[in-house]
Structures are given as C-alpha cells and as structure tokens.
Amino acid sequence: MSGPKDLKELTRSEWESLGFFYDYDDSGGTWLVRATRFGMERLCDELRRYALDPRNMEIAEHQHYGPYSYLKFVTWTEPKVIADGIYGRVDDFARLAEIIAAAIASAKPGDRIRIDEAYAMASEAKLELLLEPDNFKVASADPDLCSKRN
C-alpha cells in the first residue's frame, strides 16, 4: 500500500518528467509557468504535439497536463487564456509555441515574460513565463511537496 511519501515521490517524478511547473493564481487571474530554458522548450514541444495530433481537431477536444491535471489545452474557435487553461485552434497552439520560443530566446534566468496578449487579446487570464536557472528542480516549485506536513 502506498503512503503519502510514495504519492509525493510520484508527484515529484511527474513534475520532473513534464519539465515545467505551472500554477494558477486566482487572485491575480494568472497562469505562471516556471522552467529552465530546456523546460520551456518542453512546453513548446507539448504545444506543438497538441497541434499536430489529429484527435485534437474537433472543438472541445482537450488534454490535461501535469500531476494534478489542472492545466489543459482545449481546441476552441478562438485563442484565449482563461482560468482552466489555454484555448485555441490547433494552429493557434503551434503559434503559441513559436511565441514562447521567441520570447525565451533572448530571456535571462529570472526574467518574467507576459505572453497572453501576444497570443490572444480576448483572454480572461494572464499567461506569464518565469525563466529559471539551469539548476532549477521543477518539483521544488510545488508547495504541496515542500510542506513540512506528511
């Protein structure tokens, strides 16, 4: 039987495998993605993979990401960022990958980059990237894994 420590290790492993951390701040209406340059490239890869998957062509198709599956990419009629994820046509997801790649190319660790307006003007939420140093451990950003409880 697995206990809390096993669950924490599984969650930690899933974050590291994903390559980037995300969280949604309700009070500020902001998705924040934290990752190294490599992790940001992984995010771009996931966006491109979503765009290329023929199963995602239909409106309302979606994929969940991360150990908690909070972030989702959703095929929709227009690009937008809202509290439950990133929406758009499949070509919008490919375009978002290019926007992120271009923004990260000139960024330095510690830079915080707002992406939502470049992606979609009709967004209800913000999308920000925080470029972390190369030694950043994705799971270290998860407050549930860092708590002293359990």
Model-inferred region functions:
Residues 1-150:
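Positively charged, low-complexity terminal tracts
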